[in-house]
């Protein structure tokens, strides 16, 4: 793990000197998962954001023994969405796809802004790139300097569903073990799971199967210690699968920072989120921050921003066994809001010591069924670097299809607060598909007030008839007067209610 303050220092240095420690390769790995079709999608942000016309993408299919089957190269030189269906790319069984981007110009970030999709009957899962082969020994020095455990974003065990984990090996065979630990208010359950995986191999582990005697509907915190892998940055894909193990909703795991002492020198971190009235809105905070005791509160804001109510919802002690799980929908009703009144909400963490952990992780959950979306986010702080004198730009993906509904929410992240909370900022949104730009829209909003829209309704004239079977991917670019706005997208399968979502880049 790279320390949060080191991440901020890197951002500052890039803004001062853009050619410093330049990056010319970025990459990701995509697992082939039985029962689903693997795809990737991305907007040519290299060109749109940085005017980089010299980018190539190489996709390599890797077999079950870790050997290359074949590689294909594509020029990325148009201002549009690029989508690649990876499953079926070759006629041999595939373990993993290695996706790489190369450029003679500086790519800046070794992790590309790429969405990974796995879709099957009744579901579509999306997660941004979450593991990669490192570029050189200098990256190894920085990225793997601080080893930490991972924490699951969703421990759910009952007769109909289970948490699962997908472990991926890097470019060398991995022989070692995964150490699983489940902490509840009264017990600790542990197991050591042996691993022997070919290079670029994947292994799916269903928690219910390795802990067969756990109580039904157990609530707790799942922590996982991975074996170290050189030249590899590897998060786990973790999530919730139904009893068939083929239908799932997943995201990447969280850092467990509970043994890392890193703090901001103040006492408040927070983050605003859009409230989607069509869905259940929940947040879950885990006791995996740097050692601390935090007071957690929820601020509920009306659609117009005029009505606001804040209430404390619990104490989060890290390390510890107790998580905080709150239905914002139910809480808002207790606070006197009807669902149609709610426009946004904020999660706030207060410290009484004058310092607060740099990474306070939470799971943002939007749902309609047993498989809700799961979005991994961290709270923001006033000490984080925010460039001055420049516009903000964020971009991301929404899914469209005749059987899918998608919503997009745009909101100020929460820090730093504007001098005038009533500033009415101009928000410009440009939409793209595989043909290029298809639409532009503008809205105005102020601090804490969300812009929320249905993609299908907003772009009804531009997207036309949608496929009954195969979804498509719309990408949006949001330009704002200050780099403090963020976006969230959620997709629901109309037939099953299964959801998936992700934050913007």
Question: Residue spans of the language-model regions?
Answer:
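Gly/Pro-rich, tryptophan- and cysteine-flecked surface segments typical
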Residues: 1-505
